[in-house]
Every structure is written in C-alpha cells, then in structure tokens.
Amino acid sequence: MKPFMFIMAPVETRSGYGDHARDLITSLIEMDMFDIKIKSVKWGNTPMTGLDKDRPEHLEIEKRLYWEQGLNVQPDVMIHIGVPNEFQNWGKFNVGITAGIETTQCSSDWIQGLNKMDMIIVPSQHSKDVFEKTIFEKKDEQTNQTIGELKCEVPIHVLFEGVNIDIFKKTNEKDEEVEEMMSQVKGECFLFVGHWLKGEMGQDRKDVSGLVKVFCETFKNQKRRPSLVLKTSGADFSHIDRREIRSKIQQIKGTIDSQDIPNIYFIHGDLSEKQMNHLYNHSKVKAHISFTKGEGYGRPLAEAACSGKIVMAPKWSGHIDFLDPKFSILLNGQLTEVHDSAVWEGVINKGSHWFTTDYALAATMIKNLFVNQKAYKSRGHKQAKHISENFSLDKMKEEFKEMVKKEFPKTAKQIDIKLPDLPSMELPTLRSS
C-alpha cells in the first residue's frame, strides 16, 4: 500500500492560496507516491469556484476530496496549506506550507504554528528569512524574568510558485469579454493587478492608493499620457465592494490640484486564468506596475511578466526572487512601520515594517518608461524568458518531487512478492494390501 497523505487546503477557492494549493496537489498526484485525501477549507470570502471541470487535473483533485468529519487512521504524512497559526499536525510527519509574510516580522502565534510541524515550505527567500529571524523573549508569567527564546525550530525550505506557461504566455489571441472591458480604455495604459485592502491613503498593503495618486500627479495637465487600469477588488466581487473601489478612486482624484488628470479605470470581478493572460497581453497594456509594500511571493507579477511587457515593482520582498533587475524596473524606497489603519491582527502586526516606494523617484521612472517604451521592450522579453526557463510550473514540479524524495520520511514501499519456483514432487503411490 502507498503511504496515506492527508492534505488540508483552500483548494476550491478562487484565491492566491487556492491557485498555489491546486498546483502543489496536482504535483503530488502526478508523483503517484501517496494515497491522497484532501480536506477543502474556505479562504475568507473568496468564491469556491476554483476547480474547473474542463481541466483533467482539477477532476483528479475533485476525486480525492474528503467529506468526512474525522479521520479513522492517522496519516503517514499530513500537509496543511494556509497560515501558520492554523496549522494542524495530525500526521506521523507534518508539513506546513504557507505563502509567508509581507512584513519584517511575524507574530508569536505564527512561530508557535511553525514549530508544530516537522517541516515548512515557503515560496520565497524573503519569507524564509523573516521566519528564521523573528525571535521573541519567553518570560516567566510570575516573575516576568526572561527564561528563553521563542523562535522557529524546524527546517524551512523554499519552493517557488511556478507559472503555468501553457496559459501565461505571449499571445495575440483575443477574449470577447476582455476586449469589451478594454474597449472603454482610451489609448495606452499601465496595468495593476491585486487586492485593494484596508489602510489610509498610501498605507494599504498593495499601496493601490499611492499608485493612483502618483499616477494622477505625474500625468496631470499632460497632452500625451497613458491611462491606469486597476484589476482590483477588496473583500469580494459584490456590488458593495465595487462601489467602495469607485469611491476610493474618486476621493484620490479629489486631492489632485487639477481637473486635467489621466483616466483611471478599474476591472472588478472574477476572470479565468486564460482571461487574465489575455488582459496581460492586450495591445493597450504597455507595462505592468505595482507599488506593493510586501509580498510573500507575488504570483500575479510573475504571470504578468510572461506577456513580455516590462514590469515595474518595488525592490523588496518575495517577488525579487524572480524579477531580475537587469530585465525589470525595481523601485527604490525604504522600510516604514506598518500604519495602524493597515494592521491585521495576527497577520500584519503592529510594530512590524514593510516597504514604501519613493514616490518622487517612481514618478520619474514611470514617465521615462512611457516616453521611451521601445527602449524597454527587449528587457520585458528577457524577463519573460527568465521566468519560463527558471520559474515555470514544470520546473516547480521537478524541484518539489526532489524535495519530497529527499526530505519526507522514508516509508514502506509496496512490492510484488515472487516466490521461488519449487521442483515438482511426485507423491508416493499407495498400494492396497
């Protein structure tokens, strides 16, 4: 019998964690080394529509979904894909897989969660470094004296999130729905993809507010200028969320000391991976841009880069693993303390730091990129090649298989038993008396 592997993950959700979970689980199924059962869990309010019945690999996942409440047998290996404070260690060998951290320090609850497992897998060197460098003092509750340290005590391995280059690639194909959306965009544009999360002006995690502000200030009163397209949402894809995004954009526009400002568009709603690739490749999109304050990995930036168009993003956190500074535009800035309005208890902690882009320098680079687009074309193509050769889904699967063989415990393998051939024997003939 194959070893029993139990996986807990948001595998059905339309989320970054859902995408990551589906890729990892598909890889494990293809290895054919384990008897796999999967417990599907929610991821916030994201839709539970991540499994596509037209994709054979998703049907293989669906066949292994486990709907029972408990386990009758202890798993040989348990994998929990999620945030560390929720990790469960029900197996004989337990693996925690997390996208990691967007700031300079994780919570003590996360460190305790990491230490419940036998092994941790993260997608970037940034996440590994933060987990290994986060240390808390242990204090006696009675005397308040320091009695030790709380730090990660288990091995952490880096396995990048591979891009499916069969889907995310340079293409001239068109999607009817994407074409209809983009028909409203006037002229050339820069594209941002990501959530618009909580936080005051310039303080939300992806710094969408800062991006909109800088873009408007940079191109106000300019005769020739691009538009900015935001593929974004907040908590979900509801009408209320749509109105809130529109309101935020209008508020920022109201802070600009001119009525002559660039167009800001936003796309709100759930697009398939193929539709996202069509959006990245749309002829009006000239560059991909983000002012993100921190990424555990930054998967959308990797997928966008496969279009062959230049990517502009901060030079800090997870995405610098795959964005080569020779082929991308990495923005300068500095580490700043997380603002109270952006604190998310247990995830983005008060007192931790993340990256704030230097807006003045960014404005200069944005304008230079727009004016000198041709000069950056070859860099965009080289970045796409860099990802397809080094950060593809197939490459990730290869590295994951080697990691499983090397790091997972050796378990008994099923073998066919073949008995040796025995010489034929003749029984003695019995004679009647």
Regions found by a protein language model. Give the residues of each.
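A charged, aromatic-enriched C-terminal amphipathic alpha-helix characteristic of glycosyltransferases
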Residues: T357-L361, V371-E402
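C-terminal alpha-helical cap of glycosyltransferases
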Residues: L393-L430
